[in-house]
């Protein structure tokens, strides 16, 4: 008997993890496999990061942290964004999480109600539609092929928006294609969203 909630039964297993498992099985059989599934770094954690983690544990820096993250960490991120990326974000505008997947899911759960539509340009990160379904929303997939550098146009966005549209998930650089929207392209999409007060853009 299936005792899981209807919400969970709407979800599909992760295609990424399924591919990774299949890759591991083939490798165990001696097959030469190039695994393009999980985005695993091909280098080890740098020594100075390992040392900092060990030092933190030795100094008992392992209690519950403030919800948005330690102030010193948020200040360091703010400085990094300004010095390396030319972006001005105050520490109070920065929230630290366990990773992008948690942040995206939190945002969707905070914004989407049952029946709301979320526009997702394709190709997309496989977790996006499942997160929308978990929030009882409806993923709306907008295809963007190689002929348009895997980027949706303002015209495509306009055509996809309905009275039920709640959000657009925009990933730039794209996972998995690596395509990057220019400032002008983003401005074009923003102009469309500005005409629809209920729709918000979540940039990952």
Annotate each language-model stretch with its function.
Residues 172-175:
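Flexible low-complexity scaffold tracts in large eukaryotic assembly proteins
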Residues 44-46, 104, 128, 177-178:
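Glycine/Thr-rich phosphate-binding loops of Rossmann-like dinucleotide-binding domains
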Residues 32, 166, 199:
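Short acidic/polar active-site loop segments enriched in Thr and Asp
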Residues 99-105, 122-123, 178:
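Short N-terminal helix/helix-N-cap motif within the alpha/beta-hydrolase-1
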Residues 91-92, 109-170, 180-184, 188-191, ...:
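PLP-dependent aminotransferase-like
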Residues 203-204:
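Conserved small/polar residues in nucleotide/adenosyl-binding loops
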Residues 2-99, 106:
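N-terminal small-domain helix-loop-helix segment of the aminotransferase-like
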Residues 84-88, 194-199:
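Short helix-capping segments at alpha-helix termini
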């Amino acid at each position: 008997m299936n005792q899981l909630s209807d919400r969970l039964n709407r979800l599909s297993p992760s295609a990424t993890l399924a591919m990774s498992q299949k890759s591991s099985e083939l490798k165990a059989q001696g097959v030469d496999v190039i695994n393009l599934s999980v985005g695993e770094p091909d280098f080890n954690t740098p020594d100075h990061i390992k040392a900092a983690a060990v030092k933190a544990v030795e100094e008992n820096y392992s209690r519950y942290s403030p919800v948005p993250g330690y102030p010193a960490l948020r200040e360091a991120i703010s400085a990094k964004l300004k010095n390396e990326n030319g972006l001005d974000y105050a520490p109070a505008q920065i929230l630290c999480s366990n990773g992008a997947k948690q942040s995206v899911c939190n945002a969707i759960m905070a914004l989407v109600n049952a029946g709301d539509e979320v526009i997702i340009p394709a190709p997309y990160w496989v977790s996006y539609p499942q997160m929308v379904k978990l929030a009882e929303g409806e993923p709306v997939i907008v295809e963007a092929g190689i002929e348009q550098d895997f980027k949706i146009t303002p015209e495509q966005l306009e055509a996809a928006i309905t009275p039920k549209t709640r959000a657009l998930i925009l990933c730039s650089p794209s996972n998995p294609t690596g395509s990057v929207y220019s400032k002008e392209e983003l401005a074009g999409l923003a102009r469309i969203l500005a005409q629809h007060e209920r729709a918000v853009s979540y940039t990952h």
